[in-house]
Amino acid sequence: MKIRGFFALLLTGLLAAVAAFAGQPVAELYDKAEYRIAMRDSVALYTAVYTPKAPGEAPVIIFRTPYGCGPYGAGRFPQGFEKGYLRSYVDRGYIIVMQDVRGRYMSEGDFEHVRPAGSGETDETTDSYDTVDWLVRHIPHNNGRVGFAGCSYPGFYAMMGGLCGHPAVKAVSPQAPVTDWFMGDDVHHNGVLMLTDSYRFLSSMNTPPGRVPAAKMPSMSRQTQPDERTFFLEHTALAELTGLLKPNPFWEEMSAHPDYDAWWQERDLRRACYNVQPAVLIVGGTFDAEDCFGAWNLYRALNRQSPSTPCHLVVGPWAHGAWRNGRTLGAFDFGSDASWEYYMEHFEVPFFDHYLRDGNTDEAAPLPAAAVFSSGDNRWHTFGRFLSRGARKLTLYLAGGGILDTRRPTAKTSASTYVSDPSDPVPYCEVSGLRRPKEYMVADQRFLFGRPDVLTFVSEPLEEDMTLVGPVDADLEVTLSTTDADFVVKLIDLF
């Protein structure tokens, strides 16, 4: 049997010229200044500004982060300025701004996870506005045009920058953006607690008393050492897991809201995405185990709720954030067109250059509305704003005898049963280690065949390739012998 499924979308981009000083040490090209920018409530946010020494006006790109924007101190530059993703902005002479968000690392104030827009006198939109306003008035040689970019949690802050309303903000790129921590990103997947990731991640996000440099911030939690699966099988009660943590207000508050109630709903980024003024470039990966949901669904929300916003989507065959550093995943090499160099040259750099350097805010960037990479033929495909246009609906039926078929079963009644043992849950990867491997998203799943708690339905071998575009919905009719259950449905390719 074969089902070849690709979530495919894509685009073609512009070639961008590289500045003449490409390859020079960054200290020869840039000056660094550190500021504590006062917000409207007098809370000061640590902000590092890297300004090109070359004469002339330059656009500003801002990266706001809860993870620390070190190295701190005069004359010290991030290692990423020498090569890779950030080097693209160095070589193009952007004014690069990095800021610790409120309550994190060297910034003052109280940190709040996914602080909702409009939740008080200050939030991430007001902090973004106040930062931009200070920068355009105080940083020499800026051209008055500002962008925000960020990946994962910083992707949330990038979108908040796009919602801040400052007229200088012309373009933003939320990448793998935290959008809804209950429905799909990081903490839950379809409302089911993603325990391995959320427990490790949220326990690492406690801010210690006072402001300390990044080198002294707590490292990623080691609560799940030495073996992740064994750890969680030995600590099955949520209260027990909570007791192993240092005091963690967000974990405790989250645990008190097991359902999609108003507390979660107000933390859905999409609720604020109306009448968005800057252009938006959303980036995601089909094999992103953390925040795949955010990219697709933020794009849909913007098209529906803010139709006049120039909005672009790029989704490649990447794990979380891998468009910034690689083209391979596990045993698969998706080719040079999936490399970070290709991504930057064809998508991100042309996007920001168009709106920030060239100032073409009256016309859309020369990018497709949506570009998606098909991991079957290793090609980019382009789409209009509505991703499923031209596609046809496909229904697959689970039939008796473990058959997966496009034809509706003729039997009037049919049932498949299994017994799930909580003491031996179905593993998501064949080998359990210190933490979840990103490669599990493309790993061979046949090690699960034959387990008594897994039902497998297999089609006839496909006679030709099949490309899947759009969401996959599972419609199950079930009878339980217990009070509740979570179901995981996988549509996979046997090759």
Placement of each model-derived feature along the sequence:
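N-terminal cap/lid segment of alpha/beta-hydrolase-fold proteins
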Residues: 23-56, 458-464, 477
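Cap/lid segment of the alpha/beta-hydrolase catalytic domain
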Residues: 53-137, 187, 325-335, 451
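Accessory cap/linker subdomain of secreted extracellular hydrolases
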Residues: 82-83, 91, 125, 160-275
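Alpha/beta-hydrolase fold nucleophile elbow
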Residues: 140-152
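Glycine-rich nucleophile elbow surrounding the catalytic serine of serine-hydrolase chemistry
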Residues: 150-160
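C-terminal, loop-rich substrate-recognition/catalytic regions characterized by aromatic stacking residues
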Residues: 221-236, 328-495
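Short beta-strand/loop motif that positions the catalytic acidic residue
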Residues: 276, 282-284
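Conserved alpha/beta-hydrolase "acid-adjacent" motif
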Residues: 289-296
